[in-house]
Amino acid sequence: MEAGIVSCLKDCYPTFALGQITAGEEVAPDCVIYVEDDSGKKCVEAMLHHYRRQADPLVAQPTIATVPLGGFSQILEFVDKTPQLLPATTTIRMMLDEDVRLESLADYEARQDHYMLALFNRLNGQIRYFPWTPETGLMDLLRANSATHENGLKRYFNDQRVSWPASWPPAEVPGTQAQRRRQAKRDMSTLTDHLQALIGRSNDRVREGLFDYLVQQSAMNPALNILGLISQTIH
């Protein structure tokens, strides 16, 4: 009600309505997104930020909580066994790294791991996948055109001191996909420490910026459909 006039708001999200009724009483979010780790959390939050910049500012958006829970199997078992922790009005989603879809599921099928296959099948409607594994996606992006992305990060951080470490980017080390992921984590850690020393921002803020840059660049590739992915996740 405003100025004595009562108006109806159609199709609003539950927490918007409850917030008006409870006048500040804490309520559950409209959507909870479980991710594997802090890297996944930073990527989801960057995707949400990008989505909200594109959304109609006059349309109410859902409240979102992004929660790191550990390995993907722990996430699946947690969601499967504890659905009662959140009210029915809260949408539960899982955003898993690309390697789960490409490697882990194939491995379960090859080994006929019926328990894990049944778990994936039960929760399939709630599972979404990043178009990359965060650290690997970032390193692949930077390695593909290092000069362009060095300049891109100068603009992103608004700091001309941004530059690559010596002998950067490192050559991709041949090996298994698991070895590539571990190497990507080490390479990103080296880059993060280097940029932290150069521009004087916290390690966490630099990591957040690098993943936000990854999401921004990925959103420019229609094949990755970043906006569609996050929209389908939260609605």
Predicted regions and their residues:
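Short acidic-hydrophobic, aromatic-tinged amphipathic segments that line or gate anion-handling sites
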Residues: T66-G70, R128-P131, G200, L210
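Short, structured coil/loop segments at alpha-helix boundaries
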Residues: D37, R52-V59, D97-L117, Q216-L227
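Activity-critical C-terminal alpha-helical subdomain
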Residues: M95-D193
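Generic hydrophobic, helix-prone segments enriched in Leu/Val/Ile
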Residues: E2-C12, I127, L138-R143, L227-T233
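Short secondary-structure junctions and interdomain/linker hinges
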Residues: L85-L86, H149, Q160, W164, ...
